[in-house]
């Protein structure tokens, strides 16, 4: 992040390798590991990614984030507990666009998260309360009368993730041990 691009150039910054258990700019991510082929830094975590986003946004108004919110295996985890904070962080930095890489079909609840991210793109001033109401609405639309049980399951899964909050896992869906 040293040279400003031409004003007609959009820079796409791929957030490959972020920790999926912690929001980008919350200083909660304590694991540090190598990120092959991306940087020469020997240790990186979400703080580094947050600094890089700030740096790029300081150089250009045309930053697009490639956000990996993957659940590429049959797993219980989602990033619903960090996605709101991450998108608000991007907004505060002045990010112009967001490309979400995620599974939208098949098993799991990944499509629920992509739905809520799309809705946040249309309403970037969404509050956390509106986020929760929107999530409930998506679940009700998709699961009908049983939506509250799915919400209870999600909340339990997210609470369990926070029980192991000192653990980090890669945005591709595996623990970074």
Go through each PLM region and give its residues.
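Histidine-centered catalytic/metal-binding microenvironments
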Residues: 167-177
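Residue-level signal for alpha-helical context at structural boundaries
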Residues: 156-157, 168
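Catalytic-core regions of glycoside hydrolase
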Residues: 1-136, 141-142, 155, 162, ...
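Peripheral, non-AAA+ core regions of ATP-driven protein-machinery
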Residues: 149-153
